[in-house]
Amino acid sequence: MSLSDLARQIIKEQLDTASRSENNKNTVVYSVETGLKDPTRDGTVAQVSFKFSKPVSQDLLNIRTASILKAVSSSLDLSGDLGALENLIQATAGKKSSVGKKRSTGRVQVNFGDPSDVEDGYSGAVTGASGRFVSNSNMKIILEIVAKEYLIKDMKKAGAPLKFRTGRFANSLKIKDVMLRDSETSKGSPELNVTYNYMTRPYSVFNPAVSTYRRLSLRPYPGARNPQKLIGEAIAKAARDLIHSRYKIKVNQGT
């Protein structure tokens, strides 16, 4: 069962107990997030949101939560939602067959060092590689998905500096912001900044700024296990697939 169908079924069977009224125009969103206690170390396992025309009582939520989580764990199958995701990626990239095949970061600038955010940018729509405008939220989602694909592929190569075993490191990658800046570069290209986060405990131990010394973290050598290098290059390849070449793209770890 796809996630969208499962959400509708849960709302109908578990929470839609009151009679419907056309006067209920206000909405409220409930989120169910599963994971371990320390998000900096363990990450989020799954997150589901439900939108209702009116609030649901806390007592009803307490009674129904167990049934909701049981339905999620026993019935979830994302294959039903993959078609919509593939269409979104194809519309953004233009040529779906080329997605996931970049071997280099191209002209994308991958920055190293202390985490930082873009303070003078804004999260507007981005021109995709196909020439179509893509909403900022959609670009963040598909950029993260394709970047994870590159990261996992690189970690599975023979001689990879950091081997793919449990998948926890790769799946901890989160695109934090995709920010545009009004100022243009010297060549007249608009600037676009991508910031990301990852599970710093325990993986920041591979960052030389933490484990050895700072100078090595700013100029990672070939084959370095520096998470900023591995993740940054994966995002850069994904950005080349999905974002129009007119942008001057910079990638760095966010706070």
Swiss-Prot record:
GO terms for cellular component: virus tail. Its main location: virion. It is found in: Virion. Keywords: Late protein, Viral release from host cell, Viral tail assembly, Viral tail protein, Virion. One of its GO terms (biological process) is viral tail assembly. Putative role in tail stability. This is Tail completion protein p143. It comes from Escherichia phage T5 (Enterobacteria phage T5).
